[in-house]
Design a protein with these regions (language model features):
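Short hydrophobic/aromatic-rich motifs at helix boundaries and adjacent loops
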Residues: 54, 129-132, 178
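Charged/polar positions on well-ordered alpha helices
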Residues: 23, 93, 156-160, 174
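Peri-catalytic and regulatory segments of divalent metal-dependent proteins
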Residues: 1-110, 118-122, 164-165, 182-185
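A general structural motif at alpha-helix termini
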Residues: 86, 137, 158, 176-180
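Metalloprotease/metallohydrolase-associated module, dominated by Zn2+-dependent proteases
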Residues: 122-171
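Long, well-structured alpha-helical subdomains associated
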Residues: 168-186
């Protein structure tokens, strides 16, 4: 991804991402240690990247590679806003959400194969309908609640990381409100 996109380096915004990232990293180390998980510290090789894109997004890969798009910076508005988004994304990594999502997706795919084989054998005439029903049910019943639970957990851990790093968590609410307004086109 990074080799295919323009990574911003040396600018004041790139330096802010790095500086705030280091504060959140230190906060995450304190958080893991306080929760008896200091053995996980070596699992993360934190890296902070700013990519030149108008897209309003940020994400963290398992292992700690964080990507912020320049388009999210106006929504973040200030360092506390960046810390809110950074804390949330780091929380996904700490809670191992990426790996869990991949595992859940694999389970969903295996289930789809089983459903396809069963439909082919027992109801070949309705195989397409059976697969559509399976897809909808597994998404609504399995993947969406899973995603909502992950987002809630990342919100809680992210607020904690933000506070440990010295930022007022109330700023997170303001960022999420601005983010919501952006997505609604306001």
């Amino acid at each position: 991804f990074l080799s295919e996109n323009k990574v911003v380096k040396g600018t004041s915004d790139a330096k802010r991402i790095e500086t705030i990232g280091m504060k959140i990293k230190t906060a995450s180390e304190r958080f893991l240690t306080a929760n008896g998980k200091s053995d996980y510290l070596n699992d993360y090789k934190w890296e902070y990247n700013l990519v030149d894109s108008k897209e309003i997004n940020a994400w963290c890969m398992p292992g700690g590679k964080i990507v912020f798009y320049t388009g999210i910076l106006p929504v973040c508005k200030d360092d506390a806003g960046i810390a809110a988004v950074m804390g949330h994304e780091v929380a996904h990594a700490l809670a191992n959400h990426g790996q869990q999502r991949m595992s859940a997706g694999l389970i969903q795919q295996v289930g789809a194969v089983g459903a396809a084989l069963a439909a082919e054998k027992y109801a070949p005439k309705y195989q397409n309908e059976a697969m559509q029903a399976y897809g909808a049910a597994s998404t609504v019943g399995g993947m969406l609640p899973f995603s909502r639970a992950h987002e809630s957990e990342a919100d809680m851990i992210g607020l904690t990381l933000m506070a440990i790093a010295g930022y007022d968590p109330i700023n997170a609410v303001k960022v999420w409100e601005r983010m919501s307004a952006q997505s609604e086109g306001k």
